Amino acid sequence: MEKDLKFTASHEWVRDNGDGTVTVGISDHAQGLLGDVVFVDLPDVDDEVTAGEGFSLVESVKAASDIYSPVTGVIVEINEELEDSPEQVNEEPYESGWIARIKLSDSSELESLIPSDTYLESLDEE
């Protein structure tokens, strides 16, 4: 797993793209809990999202799970590949399985996210 990722308690990951945008997806742990992903309900470009509120839905053979935005901002890109290949969320959650890119309203929100090493330690304790 990449060390530059940050996480939420609800198992979303965030990559700071360094240009005022972040890429968001669900963690390897989350996709493992969900099982085989069969559908991803993507947000729309230009949708406004609020930190902690649902903005996407991932359906698996076991369950449907809301995906919560880790940050407040505007959707600038969605991963349309997931419409035809939702299994990428399982196969490469941190690479081709990303869900959306968000233009940050407030970059200081990134400071409240969980560093990758702390996140991994919290999983070990479960």
Swiss-Prot record:
Superkingdom classification of source: Bacteria
Keyword annotations of the record: Lipoyl
Pfam family for this entry, one: GCV_H
Cofactor(s) essential for the protein: (R)-lipoate
GO cellular component, one term: cytosol
Chain positions with N6-lipoyllysine modification: K62
Record's cofactor remark: Binds 1 lipoyl cofactor covalently.
Residue span(s) of domain Lipoyl-binding: 21-103
Quaternary structure annotation from Swiss-Prot or TrEMBL: The glycine cleavage system is composed of four proteins: P, T, L and H.
Record-linked HAMAP family: GcvH (MF_00272)
Role description: The glycine cleavage system catalyzes the degradation of glycine. The H protein shuttles the methylamine group of glycine from the P protein to the T protein.
Protein family (similarity comment): Belongs to the GcvH family.
NCBIfam families, A to Z: gcvH (TIGR00527), PRK01202.1 (NF002270)
UniProt-recorded name of the protein: Glycine cleavage system H protein
Organism: Aliivibrio fischeri (strain MJ11) (Vibrio fischeri)
Gene: gcvH
